[in-house]
Amino acid sequence: MAPSNGPRSGKNAKSSHTLKRKRAQDDLSTLTQRVEDLDIKETYKSFSDLPLSEPTASGLASSHFKTLTDIQSRAIGHALKGRDILGAAKTGSGKTLAFLIPVLENLYRKQWSEHDGLGALILSPTRELAIQIFEVLRKIGRYHTFSAGLIIGGKSLKEEQERLGRMNILVCTPGRMLQHLDQTAMFDVFNLQMLVLDEADRILDMGFQKTVDAIVGHLPKERQTLLFSATQTKKVSDLARLSLQDPEYVAVHETASSATPSTLQQHYVVTPLSQKLDVLWSFIRSNLKAKTIVFLSSGKQVRFVYESFRHLQPGIPLMHLHGRQKQGGRLDITAKFSQAKHAVLFSTDITARGLDFPAVDWVIQMDCPEDADTYIHRVGRTARYERDGRAVLFLDPSEESGMLKRLEQKKVPIERINIKANKQQSIRDQLQNMCFKDPELKYLGQKAFISYVKSVYVQKDKEVFKLKELKLEDFASSLGLPGAPRIKFIKGDDTKERKNASRATAYLSSDDDSDEGGEKKSKKDEKQVRTKYDRMFERRNQDVLADHYSKLINDDGTLVDPSKTASAADDADEDDDFLSVKRRFDAGDEDLGGNSEEELEQKGVKVVQLDGKDTLVIDSKRREKLLKSKKKLLKFKGKGTKLIYDDEGNAHELYEMEDEEDFKARGDAKEQQARFLAEETERTRTADMEDKEVAKQKRREKKEKRKARERELLAEEEAEEAVAQLAPYKEDDEFSASDREDDAPRPSKKQKVRIAEPEESKEEPWYKKSKKPAAKAPEQIQTLEDLESLATGLLG
């Protein structure tokens, strides 16, 4: 008889679970022992040689990962033993697996579950790189029971908060992670085991410094920290911020002759700034069957170049990617470019680090990178995993020498190539035509120009970035703009100062700057930086003349002769300016208040008579402009006066001051005070009595009106018949006047015609109703039917 396939008995099931648990414990202890016995100095070639758990090994095999790269072979062993690591390797060398495998293995050996909380935190500088790391984690960790999450900006914060407490592994960007640490109440990181920083040098620089410091402040100090990047930092301050404990520095290609992959061909082109767009267009037209990434320094440039080339239709799909786009759009563009065989992607540095776009043929750097590390990360988007790739760098003649020195220091081999003149196509006329027809494109061009100049201006390496040597007018023309937009932050010759400077001032300043031999200084001293507080303390009233003007006039108000000034300056002592006159007033024999109008007119000064007694002296252009504004002239006019008229029609001012003699003639001040108080007391008492009498009369009239209304209501209710007032007969006209006087007074209003209602339908007014129930009145019998109904009721 065949064995039964039914459910096992309780005893057999319990024993099988016990055996399974025991077997798992034995496997875990064996794995732990293998990790402890691992020889770090030995070089391993495949993942099967490493002490990995069964779920991790199965995930690697399913994802077709078999052979170890150099960084993986040297870093995974240290990480499995729980040491802190600083990992540095070339781009495309497999650094992602070098930290994801230790994360899975360390949590697996500790039998981590969702009840233990967050076990590993992986920080990435960009959203796209975080998404890529999360996808790799899903592939190799598909057989594990850990819960992993992706925390980036652009997603719903509330949905992330609901699921965050159940996560064991988190891949995130610094900004969003700090937001959850500060705002999510149920999110705890006290039990964190591992902290991983991918592209650590970028995360630790000034852009993320405060954010990373705040995140590290929330984390426990007893943890394992892994730092990986193509250009690793060794600064003691950065390592101290992360509380690294005796870190192991793993640099695979430190002794290599090149910091970039050997399969990468690197070239640079020296082209003026105004010809970069023409060279880029010619390159794209010559490589329509290639996959290219073009790096620019700002998002405004990316948008302008993308929109311009899209209108020109080069014959290849164009895409653009920058940080101002929505997260959904960024993901779509990343996926489309990864799947495309032939395309051009215009991008900022958000795609320069870590992203793995398959089969990229060219990397074009239209703008010079800020340093050699940025250059290495940009060109690392091609020639990945031992594949071929090519990179081209566009340099302005002023940037060539400085940038080549920086690349040489980083062991970057690069060669110069020249462009054939017959292959280059100019698109300047087309861009000018498009900017003329499309105001939005012109606006984008202006913003692109400003953002590029600003990006050059803020660079620290002034040996490479020399803003004054760039031909900005030609660059603006190459963008299709009619002229270079004004940029406020560029320091140069102040046109306003040169416009307002007078010849005499320039002559005096030239004499002051000349040395004893008579030779003038060729260059003025650079001005020191003046803050807003300096300007606040240097501020003076507008009616005080400037120092240079006070030096041009003599004590008598006449202008200084320049020839005499030059000769006198030679004999003057250096300390003559110790007690210098700030402003001179023309004081004569009269009062110091000012000169008469005749004297001012003789000196050529214009005097304007305003409404009233005041006069306005026009001695400057500011005063001339003042005459055009009525509002500003009000402060120079006298205050208006208000007149009142007495009963006799005489005009008096609103407030007239009494003469002191008249006041004394009326007696002592205290007697006047007492008399005034008595008069005012009597006046107020009389007025109070009058007010009380008026109030009493009003109350009496109100009471009489109320009683009259009540009488009228009673008279209307007692009326038994319908009464209509009709016009009088002719005989009534014969009544005598005496009879009319005896009649009742005529009402003020015309009486309305009222018809009395029958008694059956009349209701008793509310004030006449009794609280006791009224007896029912007998019904009146009017017809035979009423009599019959009454008899029927009595009999029945």
Curated annotation (Swiss-Prot):
Biased composition (Basic and acidic residues): 517-533, 663-696, 737-746, 754-767
One Gene Ontology cellular component annotation held by this UniProt entry: nucleolus
Biased composition (Basic residues): 697-706
Record domain Helicase ATP-binding: where: 76-250
Position of the signal peptide: none
Annotated GO MF terms: ATP binding; ATP hydrolysis activity; identical protein binding; RNA binding; RNA helicase activity
Domain of life assignment: Eukaryota
Record carries keyword Protein transport: no
E.C. numbers: 3.6.4.13
Family note: Belongs to the DEAD box helicase family. DDX10/DBP4 subfamily.
Protein name, UniProt field: ATP-dependent RNA helicase dbp4
Lineage start: Eukaryota, Fungi, Dikarya, Ascomycota, Pezizomycotina
Gene: dbp4
